[in-house]
Curated annotation (Swiss-Prot):
Biological role stated in the UniProt entry: Plays a role in regulation of adenylate cyclase and protein kinase B (PKB) activation during aggregation. Involved in both chemotaxis and signal relay.
Phenotype of the disrupted gene, per the record: Cells have serious developmental defects, because they are unable to activate the aggregation-stage adenylyl cyclase acaA in response to chemoattractant and are defective in chemotaxis.
Recorded GO CC terms: autophagosome; cell leading edge; cytoplasm; TORC1 complex; TORC2 complex
GO molecular function: adenylate cyclase activator activity; protein kinase regulator activity
Full protein name: Protein LST8 homolog
Organism taxonomic ancestry: Eukaryota, Amoebozoa, Evosea, Eumycetozoa, Dictyostelia
Assembly with partners or alone: Part of a complex, TORC1, consisting of tor, raptor and lst8. Part of a complex, TORC2, consisting of tor, lst8, piaA and ripA. Additional proteins, such as 14-3-3 and heat-shock proteins, may also belong to the TORC2 complex.
Entry similarity comment: Belongs to the WD repeat LST8 family.
Superkingdom assignment: Eukaryota
Compartments (UniProt record): Cytoplasm
Ranges: WD repeats: 1-28, 31-69, 74-113, 115-154, 158-197, 205-244, 247-286
Entry keyword set: Chemotaxis, Cytoplasm, Repeat, WD repeat
Amino acid sequence: MPGIILATASYDHTIKFWDPPSGGCYRSIDCGEFHINRLEITHDKLYIAAAGNPQTRLFEVNTNNNSPAMSFDGHKGNVTGVGFQKEGKWMYTGSEDGTVKIWDLKAPGCQRDYECSAPVNTVVLHPNQAELISGDQNGSIRVWDLISNTCSRELVPDGEVGITSLTISSDGGLVVASNTKGKCFVWRLGEDDTSRFEPLQKIEAHNAPILKTLFSPDTKLLATCSADHTVKIWNTKKFNVVQTLNGHQRWVWDCAFSNDSAYLVTGSSDHLSRLWDLHQGDAVKTYSGHIKAVNAVALNDLPR
């Protein structure tokens, strides 16, 4: 089993697996007409989820069999978010059909269905594994309590400006939302009540839509990827910019941190993925092979 799994997906309808040090592609999955929006690798590195339109497909990582191991049907529109419960018991998805769903991985089927009032752009799981937080095109953020099976909180930080991405710190203490106007909103979550959002900061981060925002695993950094072709790295103590990563020639769609928070992988409409050394602020490797925009990246370099 490879120690580091790095994968990208593109508008060319392929998923590619890369050897991070050499930059070589060692496997490519042709998904036909299946458009992929998001990628997520399971914690145990056995499967990769490809969220598309309107299915989510699971592929085995350590095989040359490019047929899906499982397919999850039930959404009626683009699946825009996907992730896994820590122990791999279930998967969650969000879709432009206005729903957030939970799926049983052992007996594929929709376990729960949460109705939002607008197309869902992003959904994340709290580290306590007991809440999902979704963001939609109408500008609403909702907290879904998986124990009570209800929406425990709804907030609208910037009117009807669409929420594009959400991220929660690994300690569960902070949540950040980004939107189509290039703003980020930072809240502290209540220790005993995760439906309590204490506003900390509003950041005018970019002059163009933010497409992805992500905390580093050590929670010291925040990355924002934008349609302005840049990625900005923010210190999470004061939320000031510590680096601007320049190099991509078009929109930067997605990013993923290494487990030690020292590296960042990005994907862009310029058809390329890049590996950035965050100590130097430079791209140390470029992954070239897609023939259209790279809109999703996934990295799992957790110790075995």
